[in-house]
Amino acid sequence: MKSLWNNFKVAFAMFSKIPMPCADWTKENMKYMFCFFPFIGTVIGGLTMLVAYLGLRFGYQPGFVTAVLVLVPVFVTGGIHVDGLLDTSDALSSWQERSRRLEILKDSHAGAFAVITAAVYFIAWYGVYSQLFNSAENMRAIGILSLGFMVSRCLSGIGVITFPKAKADGTVAEFSRNSSDVLSRNVLIVYLVLLAAGMILIRPVWGSLAFVGALLIFWYYHHIAMKYFGGTTGDISGFFLCICEVGMALILAVVSNF
């Protein structure tokens, strides 16, 4: 039981800014880390629902509530996945050979394409929440999206565990070596099944389309990782997580209008 608690602490310490008690980053304490990774999405989803509910309940201006909703994931995670999105965008846009792309991922400087990607990413989120935060009925769509923050992390964890690694000495490779691959993968698959059921239960068509969209983006992630990098890395995993979430959000923004 203590080992599971330590794995929980390591997962939250690594992938969020939520204060956690100290835990040694040993192999035993990282073995089941990915089993707890999706629960960071639970926190983001819960806060998203809370902000949306309070915004409707107390009549705050839609623009203000929308801005807060956009920033919730950044506040919870510290932007760790957005960093991966921007680094990967720079690498993909360079059109260099594979080894050079991997070097760009490690470069701490933001290129022009990273800046453009950041602007597009946050504007897309603002547009989505502007569309969704316009009626109590659309709280169902926000509810589906809140579960989507867990779906993206389940798929991201499965990718880290099962995809080839682009670098043998990277963070993802280290996490994968220390994790219990089969058990963690199976737990994440069970989570996915339950989350898909929950999304469909809230609103069958909306939930189904959002979940299928996430799976298609996961396929695209695998394609990009293998074709351009020879495997996945922490940055590419963050890239996937960001486009998966905003992709589900865009789908919900469109279908909720019908």
Please name every model-derived segment.
Residues 154-189, 228-229:
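Solvent-exposed interhelical
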Residues 30-46, 91-135, 144-145, 182-199, ...:
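Multi-pass membrane catalytic core of lipid/isoprenoid biosynthesis enzymes
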Residues 1-26, 164:
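Membrane-proximal soluble regions of multi-pass membrane proteins
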Residues 22, 57-61, 134-136, 161-169, ...:
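Transmembrane helix-loop junctions in multipass membrane proteins, especially transporters and channels
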